[in-house]
């Protein structure tokens, strides 16, 4: 087993953007398959779990897990590696990458920042649209791109429920809520917001931000419900695809719980989910080539404010069906200069990144696949967010077939009881 060596002439930024764990999507402290030298893993356990799938495309594979992985560094090509014996010989680094870029002053505004030494003049080309109060909606400058979801085996589960009841199509999303165009007092209908802002922003940039989504009162009620869940001990450690590998807490430091929206004390969270569904329903058929026919339950997440975050990763690296990530933030008076906690998105193939501050009543959409690697930078104050993932019908169906035929690296679980983590909504 040969390790990748450092040196000049290393991979380009676009090549680095395509290097991630084939199983969980993690993008740091990678190990390279020493046989084909084109696939990467964050640990040997994930390599073993992915072998049944990977051996079909691994050059020189012999039908068994006979190849190993070596530590990957981004700064140079490695010499050709000899085919290792069936027993892997390289030790996995036990220290997971926890490095984050420090949040700068302007990084808290939801605008694009250039990665040094990119030209700052090329960084900002915001897409603005209706929002409530004095707020505005900003989409980052990025090609159609694609979390926070956890790469979590129990996230997906077959269900056949209808979308939750929601407001009349075209109506405002909440009685006293936002979605008002700048300078206007009349709420912007969900249909107009979806078709005139979200659809074009997503198709052009792959990232879309809507501020003052539901209004101060509704946002406060959602925050109260989330804090009540936290105070009553409903949150547990965020999970990875596999808990067999070490340092999972170094990879993600959040506490989470899963909500359907019908639980006692979660009625306003249910309203939020219905409002998200309204927007997606209006967008459906117009977001790329996706046909959205379901979603997960809501993942309510809390970073406790002790400097934890979530390292750079991809929500859906393996075609599990998730196509759109939708995140709602609950953090009043958030100051990223003091509290950090920025969601930084690295759109594939772009010299810029997008910094999204987790501001109160802010809604964020982005593609869930490999086009949008992202990280949550260390948070030094309690940071709350609610995330829902929407499924593409065709990719979801293919993922289920892969699971049923033994390609379990897709991590789709079927036929779970109704109180399990994930849920399809049709």
Curated annotation (Swiss-Prot):
Protein species of origin: Homo sapiens
Regulation: Following exposure to hypoxia, activated in HeLa cells but not in cardiovascular cells.
Name under which the protein is recorded: Egl nine homolog 1
Impact upon substituting residue 371 to H: In ECYT3; decreased interaction with HIF1A and EPAS1 and decreased enzyme activity
Documented EC number(s): 1.14.11.29
Zn finger (MYND-type) start-end: 21-58
Binding site residues for Zn(2+) 2: 33, 36, 54, 58
Underlying gene: EGLN1
Modified residues (N-acetylalanine): 2
Residue numbers bearing the S-nitrosocysteine modification: 201, 208, 302, 323, 326
Modified residues (Phosphoserine): 12, 125
Region ranges (Disordered): 65-129, 160-184
Organismal lineage: Eukaryota, Metazoa, Chordata, Craniata, Vertebrata
Source organism superkingdom: Eukaryota
Subunit and partners: Monomer. Interacts with ING4; the interaction inhibits the hydroxylation of HIF alpha proteins. Interacts with PTGES3 (via PXLE motif); thereby recruiting EGLN1 to the HSP90 pathway to facilitate HIF alpha proteins hydroxylation. Interacts with LIMD1. Found in a complex composed of LIMD1, VHL, EGLN1/PHD2, ELOB and CUL2. Interacts with EPAS1. Interacts with CBFA2T3. Interacts with HIF1A.
């Amino acid at each position: 087993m040969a390790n990748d060596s450092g040196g000049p002439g290393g991979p380009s930024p676009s090549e680095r953007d395509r290097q991630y764990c084939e199983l969980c999507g993690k993008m740091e402290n990678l190990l390279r398959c020493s046989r084909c030298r084109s696939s990467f893993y964050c640990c040997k356990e994930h390599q073993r779990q992915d072998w049944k799938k990977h051996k079909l495309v691994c050059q020189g594979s012999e039908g068994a897990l006979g190849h190993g992985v070596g530590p990957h560094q981004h700064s140079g090509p490695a010499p050709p590696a000899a085919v290792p014996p069936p027993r892997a010989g390289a030790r996995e680094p036990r220290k997971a990458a926890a490095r984050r870029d420090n949040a700068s002053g302007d990084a808290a505004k939801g605008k694009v920042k250039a990665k040094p030494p990119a030209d700052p003049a090329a960084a900002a080309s915001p897409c603005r649209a209706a929002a409530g109060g004095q707020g505005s909606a900003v989409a980052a400058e990025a090609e159609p791109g694609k979390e926070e979801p956890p790469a979590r085996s129990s996230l997906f589960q077959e269900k056949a429920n209808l979308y939750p009841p929601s407001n009349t199509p075209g109506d405002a999303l909440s009685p006293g809520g936002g979605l008002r165009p700048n300078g206007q007092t009349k709420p912007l209908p969900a249909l107009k917001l979806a078709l005139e802002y979200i659809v074009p922003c997503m198709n052009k940039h792959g990232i879309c931000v809507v501020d003052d989504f539901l209004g101060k009162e509704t946002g406060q009620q959602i925050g109260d419900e989330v804090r009540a869940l936290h105070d009553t001990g409903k949150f547990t450690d965020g999970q990875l695809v596999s808990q067999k590998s070490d340092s999972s807490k170094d990879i993600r430091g959040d506490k989470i719980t899963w909500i359907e929206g019908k639980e006692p004390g979660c009625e306003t969270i249910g309203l939020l989910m219905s409002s998200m569904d309204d927007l997606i329903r209006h967008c459906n058929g117009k977001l790329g080539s996706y046909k959205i026919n379901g979603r997960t339950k809501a993942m309510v997440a809390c970073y406790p404010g002790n400097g934890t975050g979530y390292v750079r990763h991809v929500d859906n690296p393996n075609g599990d069906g998730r196509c759109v990530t939708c995140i709602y933030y609950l953090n009043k008076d958030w100051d990223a200069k003091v509290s950090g906690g920025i969601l930084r998105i690295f759109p594939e193939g772009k010299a810029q990144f997008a910094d999204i501050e987790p501001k109160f009543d802010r809604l964020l959409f982005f593609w869930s696949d490999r086009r949008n690697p992202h990280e949550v930078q260390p948070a030094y104050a309690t940071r709350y967010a609610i995330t829902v993932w929407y499924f593409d019908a065709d990719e979801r169906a293919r993922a289920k077939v892969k699971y049923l035929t033994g390609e379990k690296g897709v991590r789709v679980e079927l036929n779970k009881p109704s109180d399990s983590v994930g849920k399809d909504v049709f």
